[in-house]
Every structure is written in structure tokens, then in C-alpha cells.
């Protein structure tokens, strides 16, 4: 999470964001800003504050504002996985992270196997717990999104099948 407090890294990232948003679609010739094919810009996939929460929160705020200033026509989201069940301190605070004026909707991910709620080698025993925990996780995030008055998108979901042989 030192990225968020590294001025050079953030400067390079912001230059990339400006380049990307300023691009032209090579298929239809429209600038990305005016392209209806783009639904939303996302800050990152599963960004985490880890041991640098204040710098992370500042990065969320500034990056979302930068994107909105460059492209007011499209939605902006974080790409957050939500308040995961991992016991490690990850610097995530779903409600406060999404409570930013330039974040248009909330995102979360759901990985029942990764979070040890489901074991594909013991599916009969662990599937009921996976369903229970998944529903609880969804309700918890939905409740917070409602308080924020923002839509909620479950962006990623994963579970193994076929006895984990895939």
C-alpha cells in the first residue's frame, strides 16, 4: 500500500488515467469520453489501504475526482471487494470508502471458497455455510449501499465445481 503515498507512483498512475480517458475508440472512432460503449471507469481491481489507510483514502478521493473532471459523462466506481472476511488488516471500510461524491455506485466481490466458507472437496458439508455466509455478506453490503443511496454491484463471484477439477 506504499503506492498511495508515493508521489512518483501516483503521478505516473494519473498520467496513465489521463492517457486512457483521452483515447479514441479505434473501432468506432469516438473518444472514450463520448463513447456509450463505456459504462464506467473503475479506480482499480480490489484496491486496499493495508497499513496506509489515510493515504489510500486520499487516493480514492483524488483519483475519483480526477476521473470525473476528465469524463463527467461516465460513472465512476472503486472496484472494491467490500469488507472481506479476511482476518488480515486490509485497510478497507466499505461505507466510508464509497461515501465520496465522485463515486457513483458501490462494488463488492464474493469469493466463498477463497474465504474458507466453501470446500469443493467437502461440498455437502460446507455448501450450507457458504450460502448462509454469502447471503449475510450480500445483505450487509446492500444495507450500507442503501444508507449511501447508491446502487450496489456484485462484480465478481467465484466458487469451484466438479470437486475442484476445472
Model-derived features with residue positions:
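Active-site mouth of glycoside hydrolases
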Residues: 1-116, 127-143, 147-150, 161-166
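Aromatic/acidic polysaccharide-binding cleft in carbohydrate-active enzymes
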Residues: 121-122, 154, 158-165
Amino acid at each position: 500500500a506504499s503506492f498511495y503515498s508515493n508521489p512518483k507512483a501516483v503521478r505516473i498512475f494519473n498520467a496513465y488515467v489521463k492517457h486512457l480517458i483521452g483515447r479514441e475508440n479505434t473501432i468506432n472512432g469516438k473518444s472514450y469520453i463520448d463513447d456509450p460503449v463505456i459504462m464506467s471507469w473503475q479506480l482499480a481491481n480490489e484496491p486496499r489501504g493495508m497499513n496506509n489507510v489515510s493515504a489510500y483514502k486520499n487516493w480514492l478521493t483524488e483519483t475519483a475526482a480526477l476521473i470525473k473532471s476528465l469524463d463527467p459523462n461516465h460513472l465512476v466506481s472503486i472496484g472494491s471487494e467490500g469488507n472481506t472476511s479476511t482476518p488480515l488488516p486490509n485497510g478497507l471500510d466499505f461505507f466510508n470508502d464509497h461515501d465520496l461524491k465522485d463515486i457513483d455506485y458501490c462494488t463488492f466481490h464474493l469469493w466463498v471458497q477463497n474465504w474458507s466458507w466453501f470446500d469443493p472437496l467437502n461440498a455437502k458439508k460446507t455448501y450450507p455455510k457458504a450460502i448462509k455466509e454469502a447471503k449475510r455478506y450480500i445483505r450487509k453490503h446492500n444495507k450500507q449501499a442503501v444508507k449511501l443511496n447508491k446502487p450496489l454491484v456484485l462484480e465478481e463471484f467465484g466458487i469451484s465445481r466438479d470437486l475442484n477439477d476445472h
